[in-house]
């Protein structure tokens, strides 16, 4: 949950913005959007995969829509090609909640890596668990920097990436 909350903040969601999300997932997907005073908009799911339906995403886009949050369910990745094409067409960001599909592939890409930010929960009731925690992945350096700030209360702990000089390691 905290990882998805950080992801929403990192992509720049602001109060009043809309984020399209699936209704078929843990409530945290929607509540992380509410944390930033944004509005979760539920799109329908594909009855074959239970993942977000790209056509329903398109039907729910408004002038306030800023992002799409997919949740990969039952070990299946969402249709990321169609979803990313919609996102590109409407200049939207994409977050992937991949807690229920770690290790899944979509067209030779690992689930969670085809979005602007991918999240993997490690909560005790997920497929991979450590009791608590999570993993976020992105190939965008600006998002990575923002994620580090959000997760650490805006404090930059390591600025030079020289981990050898840290006494606490």
Region spans (language model):
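Short, solvent-exposed turn/loop segments enriched in Gly/Ser/Thr/Pro and often Arg
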Residues: 1, 75, 163
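Short, acidic/glycine-rich phosphate-metal binding loop used to engage nucleotide
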Residues: 1, 45-47, 108, 124
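Short gly/ser/thr-rich secondary-structure transition/capping motifs
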Residues: 2, 50-51, 167
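Short, conserved alpha-helix that lines the donor NDP-sugar binding/gating region
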Residues: 4-8
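PLP-dependent aminotransferase-like
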Residues: 9-98, 105
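Active-site nucleotide-sugar/metal-binding loop of Leloir-type enzymes
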Residues: 60-62, 110-115
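Active-site region of PLP-dependent enzymes
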Residues: 101-107, 114-169
């Amino acid at each position: 949950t905290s990882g998805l909350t950080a992801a929403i903040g990192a992509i720049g969601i602001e109060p009043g913005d809309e984020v399209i999300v699936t209704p078929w997932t843990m409530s945290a997907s929607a509540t992380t959007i509410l944390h930033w005073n944004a509005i979760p908009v539920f799109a329908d799911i594909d009855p074959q995969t239970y993942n977000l339906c790209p056509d329903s995403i398109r039907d729910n886009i408004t002038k306030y829509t800023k992002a799409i949050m997919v949740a990969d369910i039952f070990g299946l990745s969402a249709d990321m090609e169609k979803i990313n094409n919609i996102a590109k067409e409407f200049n939207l960001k994409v977050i992937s909640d991949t807690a229920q599909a770690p290790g899944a592939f979509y067209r030779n890409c690992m689930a969670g890596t085809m979005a602007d930010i991918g999240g993997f929960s490690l909560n005790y009731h997920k497929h991979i668990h450590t009791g608590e925690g999570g993993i976020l992945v992105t190939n965008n350096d600006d998002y990575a920097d923002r994620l580090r700030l959000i997760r650490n209360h805006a404090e930059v702990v390591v600025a030079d990436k020289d981990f050898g000089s840290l006494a606490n390691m």
